[in-house]
A protein has these predicted regions:
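Conserved ABC ATPase "signature" region
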Residues: 68, 72-95
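Conserved ABC transporter NBD signature motif
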Residues: 28-36, 43-44
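Catalytic Walker B motif of ABC-type/P-loop ATPase nucleotide-binding domains
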Residues: 124-127
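Conserved ABC ATPase signature
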Residues: 99-103
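Conserved small/polar residues in nucleotide/adenosyl-binding loops
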Residues: 159-166
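Conserved catalytic motifs of ABC-family nucleotide-binding domains
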Residues: 120
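Helix-to-loop junction immediately C-terminal to a conserved catalytic motif
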Residues: 20
């Protein structure tokens, strides 16, 4: 488990956007396992699951549908999909077939983590993963992130709230 700490405006989210391919950098190189992300874009996207700060989920799809769509975007063969396992790990099984618009904020956060996991990346990057949630839910989310580590996934969290995030 790794953390990148810094005040608001320090560029933490920009780094995530560069890694995710939604922003370009001006100079320098970023390598993942020795591969330059600019020249090996597909491999780097497969290596990283990104959990954005914003609760970007489609309100008119169920969590299960969203995971299946995400798996399809990453060309995960149907036989290799583990959406039910991921829903269970993120404690979303009971809401798997409910419209996402009916999920609480904490459930939406967990759904974003699940979507980042669906293509089985070895690295998951969490951008302010507990923003806007209460202390009890924050603890539950961190427990889920620890589960990811036990599953062998390297987790990198970006935050400016160090004192509250452990």
């Amino acid at each position: 488990f790794y953390g990148l700490l810094g005040p608001n405006g320090a560029g933490k989210s920009t780094i995530i956007n560069i890694l995710g391919g939604t922003t370009t950098k001006d100079t320098g190189k970023i390598k993942i396992w020795g591969l330059n992300i600019d020249t090996h874009r597909k491999q780097s996207k497969l290596a990283i699951g990104i959990v954005p700060q914003e609760l970007n989920i489609d309100a008119f799809f169920t969590p299960k549908d969203q995971l299946e769509l995400q798996a399809g975007l990453f060309n995960v063969p149907k036989k290799q999909r583990v959406t039910d396992y991921i829903l269970e790990l993120m404690e979303l099984t009971e809401k798997a077939n409910s419209y996402s618009r009916n999920l609480s904020g904490g459930m939406r956060r967990r759904l974003l983590v699940a979507k980042a996991m669906v293509h089985n990346p070895p690295i998951i990057i969490l951008d302010e993963p507990t923003a806007g949630v209460d202390i009890e839910l924050r603890k539950k989310l961190w427990d889920n992130f620890k589960k990811l580590n036990k599953e062998g996934i390297t987790t990198v969290s970006y935050t400016h709230l160090l004192a509250h995030e452990t």
